[in-house]
């Protein structure tokens, strides 16, 4: 990388205040800091020195997402060949490559639109470019069905970045999870592209790979089958491994668990939030099962849909989640409880994780405020009793 560092140093004077390309200084700074750690340190104020900066944090999150992404690519191919009845003649390699060719365009569109808007916004405002979309750009394709068209994805990403992030002040200032804003926009603006029985399995060929399925072919997710009153055709083993229809990166509990271990080991995600989401969801699902209000076991609610993915990667978002230790327990538990309640009580919307997290994003600051005020009150009482 020394040659690249030398090249950037050589052209850097062109972007200085007196340089001919000074108008694009923010773009150069953003590209430079993305590749290299800045060589400047603060000289005033109280500073905390840590080897983990925001860029490294986001890099670790992307690494944690890779198992879900790679398995999602394979599952896209698996579902296509399974629907065509061609599993016996298909190899792992052909299914994975086919899935990758279906998923990569969505990743490219997500990053090009999102980063393009962030670069343009930073240039317009004369601000430094942040790496905030590095994580959102890869999460967004993972939480949508493979049948979602690229044009709809581009519109949704643009809406989420501008309305859900930049108008709040940019990276670190948004109150809603950007990836979930994208999904919510798609769900409410283009519902037929995000739900139903025709969006979960790719139905065309790419470079001779895959199979063209009839226009009449439909395939529901397990939660969709439950909402329709039908029996679930997937086994618990398939639910855990992820060989079921669903959003690209949300089906494999094993792949998500690997990502969870990485996030917890690096200390990036809060174990309090993550644990309380699962506990809250499991308790309410068990109650519904005991009352005979749900046709599936309580543990199947945990492994189906976007519950695991949301609990690990989105409920723990450090920007939009609760930050106090006690508040994280309340925040996570309510998310898990709400997700299951929405699933069971609203048959028209079988997946409740998105709405549960977005709803609690609004209340995360209030939860932290109440926890802090409660601690202040306790300390004041101790002081007055001395």
Indicate residue ranges for each PLM-predicted region.
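A beta-strand-loop signature enriched in Asp, Gly, Thr, and Trp
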Residues: 274-325
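Membrane-interface helix-loop-helix junctions at boundaries between adjacent transmembrane segments
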Residues: 128-209
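Structural signature of hydrophobic alpha-helical transmembrane segments
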Residues: 96-110, 147-156, 239-253, 295-307
């Amino acid at each position: 990388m020394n040659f690249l560092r030398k090249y950037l140093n050589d052209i850097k004077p062109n972007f200085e205040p007196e340089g001919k390309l000074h108008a694009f200084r923010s773009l150069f700074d953003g590209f430079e800091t993305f590749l290299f750690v800045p060589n400047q340190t603060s000289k005033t104020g109280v500073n905390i020195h840590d080897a983990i900066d925001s860029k490294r944090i986001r890099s670790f999150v992307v690494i944690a997402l890779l198992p879900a992404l790679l398995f999602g690519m394979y599952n896209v191919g698996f579902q296509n060949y399974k629907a065509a009845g061609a599993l016996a003649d298909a190899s792992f390699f052909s299914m994975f490559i086919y899935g990758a060719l279906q998923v990569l365009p969505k990743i490219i569109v997500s990053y090009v639109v999102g980063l393009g808007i962030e670069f343009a916004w930073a240039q317009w405002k004369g601000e430094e470019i942040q790496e905030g979309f590095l994580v959102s750009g890869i999460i967004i394709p993972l939480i949508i069905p493979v049948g979602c068209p690229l044009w709809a994805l581009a519109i949704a990403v643009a809406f989420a970045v501008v309305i859900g992030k930049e108008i709040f002040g940019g990276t670190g200032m948004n109150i809603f999870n950007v990836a979930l804003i994208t999904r919510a926009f798609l769900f409410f603006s283009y519902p037929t592209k995000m739900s139903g029985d025709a969006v979960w399995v790719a139905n065309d060929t790419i470079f001779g790979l895959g199979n063209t399925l009839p226009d009449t072919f439909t395939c529901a997710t397990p939660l969709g089958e439950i909402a329709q009153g039908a029996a679930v055709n997937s086994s618990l083993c398939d639910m855990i491994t992820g060989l079921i229809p669903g959003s690209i990166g949300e089906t494999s509990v094993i792949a998500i668990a690997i990502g969870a271990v990485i996030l917890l080991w690096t200390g990036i995600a809060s174990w309090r939030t993550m644990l309380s989401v699962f506990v809250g969801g499991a308790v309410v699902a068990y109650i519904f099962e005991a009352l005979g209000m749900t046709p599936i076991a309580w543990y199947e609610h945990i492994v189906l849909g976007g519950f695991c993915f949301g609990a690990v990667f989105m409920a723990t978002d450090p920007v939009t989640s609760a930050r106090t230790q006690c508040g994280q327990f309340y925040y996570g538990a309510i998310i898990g409880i709400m997700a299951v309640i929405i699933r069971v009580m609203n048959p028209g919307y079988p997946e409740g994780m998105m709405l549960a997290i977005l709803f609690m994003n609004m209340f995360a600051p209030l939860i932290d405020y109440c926890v802090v005020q409660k601690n202040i009150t306790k300390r004041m009482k101790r002081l007055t009793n001395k």
